Every structure is written in structure tokens, then in C-alpha cells.
């Protein structure tokens, strides 16, 4: 009798995606993050669903409903801590996943790469929308500052900002719609992730060498299911350690105070995973210029495939490109640090230099390094 997983219409899809999928024999732990992101998404949807059962999206009761979840709901404190810190784990995996793609040249699967940038944007939108529902001071002022950026758009900006707010400022209508967006967008992300996988399985996975290894493929199960399970163990270890021992370490203390439109916090900043983009936004003295730089910081990912000049796909054997990549990684950490600092010297100039150093390797230095490495590999005799 033929195995059911190979004949059943639904089982067949799962089989071709996770069991009999031909995978390169040499993919490293850097290829774990796709499955970890899937797990993170499931954790966020499940914990979010239970939080939504007890949350009320009204300006008068939102803050106290979150306190009620933590105090009175069975394991509500744990569900909330897992949800809040799960977002941090989600972004950590996302950044490492994108970094892996850049380092090993995975972006040359253009459709897979581009359909991956779209969920990245959607995750960022979801996380921003999710920062508003607790209705603390930083929730309110973060929403005010970021949505205010829309007013920088010429001609339609102010109208657009007021349309998003549902009034003349961030208020009850804004909170309700942001909660609605935050609830629905994870399901959109799940659909986009399936499309991302669909395109990936058209070509098969890349591997550290960047070479096509058609003759040397192994089945995904049991080799990579076990490997992914190990990655999941580490993910859960870090997430549970954060949620149980230090749940508020990545949050902002201002968010323990209820939202007050009459009292501005001394330093408005988003969650840590947006700080790099926030630093780029603040480094431009012009409002519209800052918004464009903010968008460009993510949109540059879309043009990376067209800036690839090297004859080799992966950076594994390209030391000059490797150096530039790690400069970029260190620079992202610098931007994250700057985004959390007040707007004063020397942080302003450091932020401006770091912003220039963010775009330079991607747009100029890496393509030039690729050409230089091609030249160095050419036989000179």
C-alpha cells in the first residue's frame, strides 16, 4: 500500500514541504531561523488570542484591563510576558534571518527575497500597532510621534494623519483601530509566510557555499527536523528565561504609567527592535527627509539583488565583502544604541555618521568589493 502522506491531497503538501523535501546536505544552523520564525508567529498568535479575550480597547479601561490580565487572570502574567518578549525574539530571529540571506547570497532567489521583505514590513507594522493597546505613556506618545510623520507627506499629509487617527489627535478611535489592525495582521503574515515558502520550494534552499548542489540532497526529515528542534529548544530557553526572570528588561519604564496627553515623557522612543530605524529617522534634520530615510532603511533590501556584482554567490570565500558585512552589522548595533539616546551631542553626530555608514556598504562598497574580488580571482598570467 502506498504511503498515505504521498497520496492524500493535504498530507501531500505537508510531505513535500517538511518531510520528503530535498535539502542541501551542508546547511548550517543559520538556516534554522525560518522555522523559528514560524514558531514565534504561532506563539504570538496564541498568546495574543488569549490576551484579546480579556483586553478592552477603550481609552478609559485599556490600561487597567492589562493590569487585570496580569493580576486576576489565570496565568495572565505569563501570557502577557510571553507575548511581550515573544515580539523581541521574533525580531531577533528576523534580523538574523535577513543577515543570513545577505551573507550567503540568498537574495539571488529574487522572488523569495522580495516576498520576504513584504512580511518584514507587515511584522513591523504589526509590532508598532501592538505597542499602542497597553495605553501606557510610551504607547500613547510613540503612536503620536510616529503617526505624526505622515503629516510630512506634501499636500495630503495632515489629512492622512487625521484619517489614521480618526480625529484630530491619538484618541479612542486610534486605539480601537490599532487593536483591530494588531489582531488581523498576524494572519496576513501567516499567509505571506506560506507564499514565501511556496517560492522557496520552487528553487530549493541556498547553502553556505552558494553552489548548486543538486546531486547532494538529503530528505528534510529526520535530519533537519531534529536540527530545527534543537534551535527551538534554545529559542524557548531564552524566551522563557526572559518571560519568567526579567520580563520588563526590554520594555520602557514609562509604560507603567497610564497614557496622559498633558504630560510628555522626557525621551520618546520605540521598542529596541525599531531603534536602528528611529536613529536614521532622527539623523535627518528635515521631517520629510527623515521619513524618506526611514523608508529607505528597509526598502534598500529590495534592491540588494540588483547590486550583486561578484561571480561568487556566497560571502564565504570573499574576505573583503565579509569585512564590509560585519562593519554593517556593528553599525546596526551602533544605530540601535543611538536610537535609545537623547537628541544631544555627541549622539546627534554619531547617529548621522552611523546612518551614512548604514547606506554606504549596501549601495556602494559591497558592489565595488564584488568587482574587486572578481578582479583578484582572475588569472594574471
Curated annotation (Swiss-Prot):
Cofactor note: Binds 2 heme b groups non-covalently.
Residues given in the record as heme b b566 binding sites: 97, 196
UniProt keywords, alphabetically: Electron transport, Heme, Iron, Membrane, Metal-binding, Mitochondrion, Mitochondrion inner membrane, Respiratory chain, Transmembrane, Transmembrane helix, Transport, Ubiquinone
Binding-site positions, a ubiquinone: 201
Main localization, broad class: mitochondrion
Protein localization: Mitochondrion inner membrane
Cellular component aspect of the GO annotation: mitochondrial inner membrane; respiratory chain complex III
Protein name per Swiss-Prot or TrEMBL: Cytochrome b
Species the sequence originates in: Sminthopsis bindi (Kakadu dunnart)
Gene name tied to this protein: MT-CYB
Amino acid at each position: 500500500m502506498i504511503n498515505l502522506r504521498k497520496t492524500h491531497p493535504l498530507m501531500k503538501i505537508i510531505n513535500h514541504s517538511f518531510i520528503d523535501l530535498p535539502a542541501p546536505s551542508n546547511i548550517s544552523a543559520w538556516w534554522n531561523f525560518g522555522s523559528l520564525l514560524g514558531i514565534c508567529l504561532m506563539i504570538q498568535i496564541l498568546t495574543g488570542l488569549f490576551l484579546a479575550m480579556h483586553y478592552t480597547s477603550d481609552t478609559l479601561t485599556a490600561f487597567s484591563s492589562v493590569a487585570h490580565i496580569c493580576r486576576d487572570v489565570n496565568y495572565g502574567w505569563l501570557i502577557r510576558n510571553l507575548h511581550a518578549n515573544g515580539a523581541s525574539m521574533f525580531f531577533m530571529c528576523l534580523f538574523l534571518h535577513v543577515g543570513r540571506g545577505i551573507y550567503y547570497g540568498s537574495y539571488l532567489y529574487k522572488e523569495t527575497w522580495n516576498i520576504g521583505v513584504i512580511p518584514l514590513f507587515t511584522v513591523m507594522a504589526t509590532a508598532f500597532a501592538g505597542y499602542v493597546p497597553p495605553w501606557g505613556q510610551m504607547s500613547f506618545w510613540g503612536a503620536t510621534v510616529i503617526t505624526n510623520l505622515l503629516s510630512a507627506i506634501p499636500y495630503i499629509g495632515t489629512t492622512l494623519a487625521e484619517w489614521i487617527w480618526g480625529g484630530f489627535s491619538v484618541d479612542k478611535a486610534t486605539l480601537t483601530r490599532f487593536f483591530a489592525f494588531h489582531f488581523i495582521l498576524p494572519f496576513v503574515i501567516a499567509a505571506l509566510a506560506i507564499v514565501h515558502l511556496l517560492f522557496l520550494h520552487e528553487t530549493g534552499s541556498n547553502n553556505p557555499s552558494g553552489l548548486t548542489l543538486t546531486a547532494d540532497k538529503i530528505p528534510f526529515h529526520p535530519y533537519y527536523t531534529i536540527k530545527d528542534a534543537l534551535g527551538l529548544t534554545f529559542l524557548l530557553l531564552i524566551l522563557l528565561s526572559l518571560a519568567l526572570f526579567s520580563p520588563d528588561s526590554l520594555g520602557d519604564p514609562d509604560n507603567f504609567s497610564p497614557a496622559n496627553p498633558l504630560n510628555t515623557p522626557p525621551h520618546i522612543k520605540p521598542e529596541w527592535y525599531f531603534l536602528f530605524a528611529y536613529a536614521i529617522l532622527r539623523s535627518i534634520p528635515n521631517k520629510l527627509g527623515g521619513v524618506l530615510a526611514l523608508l529607505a532603511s528597509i526598502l534598500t533590501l529590495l534592491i540588494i539583488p540588483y547590486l550583486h556584482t561578484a561571480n561568487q554567490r556566497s560571502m564565504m570565500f570573499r574576505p573583503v565583502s565579509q569585512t564590509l558585512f560585519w562593519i554593517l552589522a556593528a553599525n546596526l548595533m551602533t544605530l540601535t544604541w543611538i536610537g535609545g539616546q537623547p537628541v544631544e551631542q555627541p549622539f546627534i553626530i554619531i547617529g548621522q555618521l552611523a546612518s551614512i555608514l548604514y547606506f554606504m556598504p549596501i549601495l556602494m562598497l559591497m558592489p565595488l568589493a564584488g568587482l574587486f574580488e572578481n578582479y583578484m580571482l582572475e588569472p594574471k598570467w
